[in-house]
């Protein structure tokens, strides 16, 4: 389990820790009043946050007395805060040379080395600090944190345990030890440490957050949600807690709340690839490819060499209907990771969407060379062969897919459809029933079975299959219209008329939604291109076709807002929120 990395970063917290350490600070006697005055001037400047003035003063003190450890140390701290790490290391080494038995001097040097990424050298200095001050729990804590950065978790755990021996009442130590246990999937020990941290300090927010994340990893979603909500009450700006809350809500199949949690996380930490990725995947599953594309594009700005990120973006582009751009992203994913059969398979799917069946067949066969036992690949190859009118080869591939995975319902379904289209109705019905047996909620399989049975003149059974398809998917227009035809043949004219009306209404509604979605997506592209009036026109077209389409109202509000029509924009934002409460208007500028 990934925990909040900042909890373990020695570079972020060592100064605060060392300020509490009961280890002697450099106390070399200041040689004269000029040095003393410069040194005190620097301390005063630091206390008010004026780093340039502090640096000038400490540089003066060091120039006057190069062997004064206090001045060298303070100059090193200023340089470190200014990001001049190499120069800070020089100053801290000078302090160590002047006072080699001073633990805090080694700790400051370790901090600078760790900031530079020189973890081996940093750990060496932290170990010296521990040897010089073995009774100081903060020294063990700092060493443990540095060791965890090198993934030396067992050694880090040992140091945290020693820190707890010295200071059992410190909640943060139990929390950090619990986090290390969680990284090793030792969840029972982790939970015990988090609970102890909360016993010691019931308002210690990190322990609630870490306990929630640990419980989430164990599948205890209800308890995890309770802990994460408590953490967010204490710290509403904890982006990682919002992220884990989204994970928990997804596990509970509450996609609305999950989306809200991810939106908070992205807003608070807009440059974290993991959060953006999870956000994009949920958007894609919810049928919002436009926002998914934006999320995955953001991921690629953060991790341009991540093959999975290119693959995710390509899948979202496919869902948006942009197969041409998707092809390029799949090809880049394959370039970065050429042995991934899944990327190869997805590229074949993109060729299918472009109706380039020959390229799709070639791509699926290339993927099968990498993974010849992958049933879904044989299924996709069969589909491409069928679309190329090579039915015998397609049927053979579907049979291979079924042999490799007897539970692959899609293969039975596709084979059944192909046999039906070939005129072998009994064999088709057998395959469709097999698909339904494996996946009883397969609405399309019930619908197709009903259609096949209708053609076999088994009308009562056909009606039953079609009614089941409608029960599973009430908006399945084709099932309503086919059932209407079956009922008409059975003499149920009233039932047939009702189903016919329902089917027609659904077709009309679906067509309107498609038109509204197309117009809204067109408006978004025009808005991105700077054509404000064109975008507004397209959003209004979408609303005219489908007045209850919330996203069109929201996008129209955004466009009107950009044009300076604040009142009208506000009305559109309110309408969008009424239709979909998750479409929250942006806060007014200046707030």
Where are these regions (language model features)?
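Alpha-helical adaptor scaffolds
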Residues: 77, 417-420, 511-528
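Structural signature of tandem alpha-helical TPR/SEL1-like repeats
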Residues: 47-60, 81-94, 104, 115-128, ...
